[in-house]
UniProtKB/Swiss-Prot annotation:
The Tat system comprises two distinct complexes: a TatABC complex, containing multiple copies of TatA, TatB and TatC subunits, and a separate TatA complex, containing only TatA subunits. Substrates initially bind to the TatABC complex, which probably triggers association of the separate TatA complex to form the active translocon. The keyword Thylakoid does not apply. It comes from Shewanella pealeana (strain ATCC 700345 / ANG-SQ1). GO terms for biological process: protein transport by the Tat complex. HAMAP family: TatB (MF_00237). Residues 68-83, 116-131 have a biased composition (Polar residues). This is Sec-independent protein translocase protein TatB.
Length: 131
């Protein structure tokens, strides 16, 4: 935990803390500092895990690019497994959007078409003189 800090440095920090904070506030300060350190470590581990996950995704993406360049022929079993995993992930991401987009796309043009025709007809009649 204290890489690079020796016993003498820790002793000096403890004595300074005791002098500055006093014996009543020192335990509370040590507890709060240790909780901050714990929170920082959790945050660092979280970032590390996210980066590892992103690197795995990037590796799968590069494997897919390699497979496409080889024409999906004579693939190693590891590469084929990576491609299958990537395809499954892509399908699971695309499915919810496909279901929602299809009904919305069908309704929108049907409503817009009559409105456009009415405005065109109205515009054509207004150009003609009344009489």
């Amino acid at each position: 935990m204290f890489d690079g800090i020796g016993f003498m440095e820790l002793l000096l920090i403890g004595i300074l803390g005791l002098v500055v904070l006093g014996p009543e506030r020192l335990p509370t300060a040590v507890r709060s500092i240790s909780s901050w350190i714990r929170a920082m470590k959790k945050m660092a581990n979280s970032v590390k895990d996210e980066l590892e996950q992103e690197l795995k995704i990037e590796q799968l993406h590069s494997d897919l690019k390699n497979a496409e360049s080889q024409g999906l022929k004579n693939l190693s079993p590891e590469l084929q497994d990576s491609i299958d995993q990537l395809k499954e992930a892509a399908q699971s991401v695309n499915r919810p959007y496909q279901v929602e987009d299809v009904p919305a796309a069908k309704e929108t043009p049907a409503k817009e078409t009559p409105t456009a025709e009415k405005s065109t007809t109205t515009g054509a009649n207004s150009d003609k003189p009344n009489g």
